[in-house]
């Protein structure tokens, strides 16, 4: 039975884990790291780079290096948060054909789900390399406060990557699952999850293998990227004040600032001050300019203090929805790389009135929880029951544009709820059901998930027809809605797809593109391996020829030299088959050289057998043979 992997698809970094027996293992990638940058780059030669290789070349290729794309998943292009993001990144955010926010690299448009799929593909490869077998099933985590459109887009990303997504699980819930599995005693816990791009807080109760989410809250556009942006702005402002040049206008300089800001932020978690030194950051008529600046922890904290305070309001709301006070929280778990910042730890400690638990790795615990959930779904882990909730209220638009809730936020999922509505006009033959998600009282202020029409309603005065609307939320938090006319039993049902979202044909095309990319990547890998083998073989044979000298017959030597020349010619091209063929010919020639050297060695040995050193003739002509003598202990021979 194939393994189910757990993937933490992060804004900044991603992580993959697997449950093996009673242990959950985080899998190292090909570079030996336990987390992989959620970055995808497209080089000028058309090659796609994912992870660390993409990050390494970001400074020289900023316009085609895509990062933090998770923040765009399931969002419309005209979303205010997208407009804000456009000013912060060096790559292009464009409008997709469906009105969603897409990205552009090397002149080609990509859906955020596609970019996420490339990262998931890297996680899949990492797991397959470790397991030595194909992987087709996964549990993928999302921020708890992701809406339906964002969850659906994440599931689409898994499908594009060639994965069957068995479950979409909330990140804080996954962390609690990993934590709860090792915790013997029950209790009420708070998970404070501040990652690269999103913030979530969940209140959970753990008791006898049951992990129940009581409430969740958060902000899907608040994370480490925003902290970096504050540092970037500070550096750019300081440089402009000193040199009169705005570095924000230079994409290459902006990418260097981004890397320096992230590095400084990390360093200031363990030191009080750091120096940012960026030589040749730009130039003007007077010559090159360098950025050299000291940044203290106190200055960083003052730059981001309001961002840290923004996380406190969701914490208050989560406690209120769970009907518990901060004093009733038994333990606080910190998740996400940003929770390493001392100021964040201090703020959490102050809010909850207790020291946060330090026995979990904030970068890995979510992936571990996802792997545990995968094992639960496979039946490998028993006696664990996970009860999650829907983060936002669901309802429809009714007369006057009012948002009428059918399912309140923090309702345990899966769940199903029905409510009966009627028509607003006499003889109304059809109704349009508009489905919204959010907490505002007017429908227009909430997120429109989708709409559909129920037609063929029997003519009747307003208020008479009975139209039953049913909401069904599955364990992934994905919504289906149906409407039925009770008089005619006519029913219309839709699985909610974002008002933009990817169509089935879009997804199928992207799956094919991903498969084509995988084939191309395999071909590139084969070519690289063939090149390496050919170069190594050519060098080896040249060395053998030089060492052998005249021991090799002229015909064999000429054949080997011709084979080496053929390999060198093939190395100039990019035909793996031609390289392999030339290498095979050279390999045969190498064998002949080896045989010739061996025969020459044997002949020398045979000739040397009768030489003076091997024996001598005595004075009377008799043969005297050299012999080795060994002293023997008399006692032993007695």
Curated annotation (Swiss-Prot):
Domain of life: Bacteria
UniProt key word Acetylation: no
Swiss-Prot/TrEMBL induction comment: By stress conditions e.g. heat shock.
Molecular function as annotated in GO: ATP binding; ATP-dependent protein folding chaperone; unfolded protein binding
Region listing for Disordered, in residue ranges: 604-638
Matches recorded under Pfam families: HSP70
InterPro entries: ATPase_NBD, Chaperone_DnaK, Heat_shock_70_CS, HSP70_C_sf, HSP70_peptide-bd_sf, Hsp_70_fam
Start-end of Gly residues biased regions: 607-618
UniProt keyword list: ATP-binding, Chaperone, Nucleotide-binding, Phosphoprotein, Stress response
Entry annotated with the keyword Membrane: no
Function: Acts as a chaperone.
Family of this protein: Belongs to the heat shock protein 70 family.
HAMAP family on file: DnaK
This protein's name: Chaperone protein DnaK
């Amino acid at each position: 039975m194939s393994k189910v992997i757990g993937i933490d698809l992060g804004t900044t970094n991603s992580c993959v884990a697997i449950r093996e027996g009673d242990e959950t293992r985080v899998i190292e990638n090909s570079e030996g790291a336990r987390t992989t940058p959620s970055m995808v780059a497209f080089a000028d030669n058309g090659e796609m780079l994912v992870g660390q290789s993409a990050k390494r070349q970001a400074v020289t290729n900023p316009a085609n290096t895509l990062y933090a794309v998770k923040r765009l998943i399931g969002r419309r292009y005209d979303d205010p948060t997208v407009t804000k993001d456009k000013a912060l990144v060096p790559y292009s955010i464009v409008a997709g054909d469906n009105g969603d926010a897409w990205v552009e690299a090397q002149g080609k448009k990509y859906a955020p789900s596609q970019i996420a799929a490339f990262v998931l593909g890297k996680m899949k490869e990492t797991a397959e390399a470790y397991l030595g077998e194909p992987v087709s099933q996964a549990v993928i985590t999302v921020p708890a406060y992701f809406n339906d459109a964002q969850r659906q887009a994440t599931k689409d990303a898994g499908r594009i990557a060639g994965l069957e997504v068995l479950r979409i699980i909330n990140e804080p819930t996954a962390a609690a699952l990993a934590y709860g599995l090792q915790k013997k005693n029950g209790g009420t816990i708070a998970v404070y999850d501040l990652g690269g791009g999103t913030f979530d807080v969940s209140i959970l109760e753990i008791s006898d293998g049951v992990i129940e989410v009581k409430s969740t809250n958060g902000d899907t556009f608040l994370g480490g990227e925003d902290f970096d942006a504050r540092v970037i702005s500070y550096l750019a402002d300081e440089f402009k004040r000193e040199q009169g040049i705005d570095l924000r206008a230079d994409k290459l300089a902006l990418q260097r600032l981004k890397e320096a800001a992230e590095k400084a932020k990390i360093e200031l978690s363990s030191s009080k001050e750091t120096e940012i030194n960026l030589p040749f950051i730009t130039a003007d008529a007077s010559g090159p300019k360098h950025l050299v600046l000291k940044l203290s922890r106190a200055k960083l904290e003052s730059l981001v203090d309001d961002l840290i305070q923004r996380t406190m309001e969701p914490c208050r709301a989560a406690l209120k929805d769970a009907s518990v006070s901060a004093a009733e929280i038994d333990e606080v778990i910190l998740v996400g790389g940003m929770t390493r910042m001392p100021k964040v730890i201090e703020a959490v400690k102050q809010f909850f009135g207790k020291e946060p638990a330090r026995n979990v790795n904030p970068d890995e615990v979510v992936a571990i929880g996802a792997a545990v959930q995968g094992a639960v779904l496979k039946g490998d882990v028993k006696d664990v029951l996970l009860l999650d909730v829907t983060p936002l209220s669901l309802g429809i638009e009714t007369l006057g544009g009012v948002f009428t809730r059918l399912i309140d936020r923090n309702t345990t999922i899966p769940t199903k709820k029905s409510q009966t509505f009627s028509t607003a006009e006499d003889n109304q033959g059809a109704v349009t059901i508009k489905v919204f998600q959010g907490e505002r009282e007017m429908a227009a202020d909430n997120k429109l998930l989708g709409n559909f029409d129920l037609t063929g309603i029997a003519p009747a005065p307003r208020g008479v027809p009975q139209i039953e609307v049913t909401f069904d939320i599955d364990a992934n938090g994905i919504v289906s809605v149906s409407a039925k006319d009770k008089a005619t039993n006519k029913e219309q049902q839709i699985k909610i797809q974002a008002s933009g979202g990817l169509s089935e044909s879009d997804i199928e095309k992207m799956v094919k593109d991903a498969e084509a990319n995988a084939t191309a990547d395999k071909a590139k890998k084969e070519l690289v391996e063939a090149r390496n083998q050919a170069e190594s073989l050519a060098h080896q044979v040249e060395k053998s020829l030089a060492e052998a000298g005249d021991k090799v017959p002229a015909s064999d030597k000429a054949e080997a030299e011709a084979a080496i020349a053929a390999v060198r010619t093939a190395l100039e091209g990019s035909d793996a088959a031609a390289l392999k063929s030339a290498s095979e010919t050279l390999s045969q020639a190498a064998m002949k050289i080896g045989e010739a050297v061996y025969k020459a060695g044997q002949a020398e040995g045979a000739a040397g057998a009768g030489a003076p050193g091997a024996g001598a003739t005595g004075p009377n002509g008799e043969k005297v043979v050299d012999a080795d003598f060994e002293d023997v202990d008399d006692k032993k021979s007695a």
